[in-house]
From Swiss-Prot:
SUPFAM superfamilies: PLP-dependent transferases (SSF53383). Keywords: Aminotransferase, Pyridoxal phosphate, Transferase. The keyword Glycoprotein does not apply. The modification N6-(pyridoxal phosphate)lysine is found at K287. Pathway: Amine and polyamine biosynthesis; 1,3-diaminopropane biosynthesis; 1,3-diaminopropane from L-aspartate 4-semialdehyde: step 1/2. This is Diaminobutyrate--2-oxoglutarate aminotransferase. The gene is dat. The keyword Signal does not apply. Belongs to the class-III pyridoxal-phosphate-dependent aminotransferase family. Its EC number is 2.6.1.76. One of its GO terms (molecular function) is pyridoxal phosphate binding. It holds the Pfam family Aminotran_3. InterPro entries: Aminotrans_3, Aminotrans_3_PPA_site, Dat, PyrdxlP-dep_Trfase, PyrdxlP-dep_Trfase_major, PyrdxlP-dep_Trfase_small.
Length: 454
């Protein structure tokens, strides 16, 4: 049979494909502007472009590729489905594969407490479903979200998102969203900093909910990330997550935790909320849940399953290839204890980066959990604020990312103004690859400083 899919690399430059992309695709595209190359092949934590250049990938599909690129067991899972005759698309009809995937995913939650809801294929779809369910169950319309949070780009999910860049261009987003400050020990929203600042946010949240004159109607739900990713890799303190759980339970408010990016071993636990020992009412999952393919799922405490049949539907709920790769990924995560690997590799990277900050004080803060880390790039030549934080240096952070690309290291930035360099590699990364990251990142900092500050 003649191959009809143009997957073979042709003799052309990265710029050739970027120019064609510029002609054929909308101005909305983002990653090619900062990472200007065209994929030819990839394996594990390594990517090769059409010119033969090899890169160390610390982006991992924005967290989707928990096992890296083209893991052989996942590739075999895809082949097995293709050879089986199983339909690739089944709506919400069941199959033996879906049954096995569902059982495996539920095994990571407390026994007999949760059920699954398959939604559309993206995290935004799943967050929309979670909010709709909370409103259906409670009969209330308001939602509390947090500054710096990111929950997707659809109308409802965008209304829950803190970043104003995408929101300012769109009117009439979902009403009834009240934003609260998110604890940040380095850049405290109350200007206190450290543990005291985090405690102040806890007290503010509790008072806000319980104050009969706060001006906010009792919400249907509180939605948050246990680790804010796009917001600059900010980890919620354990006590804060516990306080939110305590207050929401006390007042009959659903607690929704968005684990789209932080979930599936990335934080050093299967789910980031597990660090606090809590049980959310709804857990939102996408990205890594599908083993690199599109899939999104809610885990819902059984007592909150208020849906009527067909109360929330979606065409792409039955992606059998994603369930195959998702099932295989879950087995590998458990069998190889990848949560522990993420914890150990994350500790190494954190310590190495903090040592690097002594030599290069533009690295103002290194934070995160496991292999979800943020490197806060600052202008240490300026005065610190009242909490001890230097001003953000967004220009230098952009230059570091650009230098990383030249040094064949792929990564992304986040946070206010994009001053936080993000570590989001595969959770099965090995020690030598982590050491190579430090080597390339250090050289990139040196190169960027020469460009921006010399």
């Amino acid at each position: 049979m003649t191959m009809i899919t143009p997957v073979q690399a042709i003799l052309a430059s990265n710029q050739h494909f970027l120019d064609r992309q510029d002609v054929m695709e909308s101005n909305v595209r983002s990653y090619p502007r900062k990472l200007p190359f065209a994929y030819a092949k990839a394996q594990g934590c390594w990517v090769t472009d059409v010119e033969g250049n090899e890169y160390l990938d610390f982006l991992a599909g924005a967290g989707t590729l928990a096992l890296g690129h083209n893991h052989p067991i996942l590739m075999q899972a895809i082949k097995d489905v293709l050879d089986s005759g199983l339909p690739l698309h089944t709506l919400d009809l069941t199959t033996p594969l879906k049954d096995a995937f569902s059982e495996e995913l539920l095994s990571f939650f407390p026994k007999d407490k949760y059920i699954l809801q398959f939604t559309g294929p993206s995290g935004a779809d799943a967050n929309e479903a979670a909010i709709k369910l909370a409103k259906t169950y409670t009969g209330r319309g308001n939602i509390i979200a947090f500054s710096g949070g990111f929950h997707g780009m659809t109308q409802g999910a965008l209304a829950l998102t803190g970043n104003l860049g995408a929101k300012n261009a769109v009117e009439n987003l979902m009403p009834g969203v009240q934003f609260m400050p998110y604890p940040h020990e380095y850049r405290c929203p109350f200007g206190i900093g450290g543990e005291a600042g985090a405690k102040a946010v806890e007290q503010y949240f509790e008072n806000f909910i319980e104050d009969v004159e706060s001006g906010v109607v009792k919400p249907a739900a509180v939605i948050l990330e246990a680790i804010q990713g796009e917001g600059g890799v900010v980890s919620a303190p354990i006590s804060f997550l516990q306080k939110v759980r305590e207050v929401t339970q006390k007042h009959g408010i659903l607690m929704i935790v968005d684990e789209v990016q932080a979930g599936f071993c990335r934080s050093g636990r299967m789910f980031a909320f597990e660090h606090a020992g809590i049980e959310p009412d709804i857990i939102v999952m996408s990205k890594a849940v599908g083993g690199s393919l599109p899939l999104a799922v809610l885990a819902i405490r059984k007592e909150f399953d208020a849906w009527q049949p067909a109360g929330h539907t979606g065409t792409f709920r039955g992606n059998q290839l994603a369930m195959a790769t998702g099932y295989a990924s879950l087995k590998i995560m458990r069998d190889e204890n990848l949560a522990q690997n993420a914890q150990e590799r994350g500790e190494y990277l954190t310590n190495a980066l903090r040592e690097l900050s002594k030599e290069y004080p533009c690295i103002g803060n290194v934070r995160g959990r496991g292999l979800m880390m943020g490197i806060d790039i600052v202008d240490e030549r300026q005065s610190k604020d009242a909490t001890g934080a230097y001003p953000r240096d967004c220009e230098l952070a952009a230059a570091i990312q650009k230098a990383c690309f030249k040094n064949k290291l792929l990564l992304e930035r986040g946070g206010r103004g994009g001053n936080v360099v993000r570590v989001l590699c595969a959770v099965n990364i090995n020690q030598s690859e982590c050491e190579e990251f430090i080597k390339r990142f250090k050289q990139s900092v040196v190169d960027a400083l020469k460009v921006v500050r010399s």
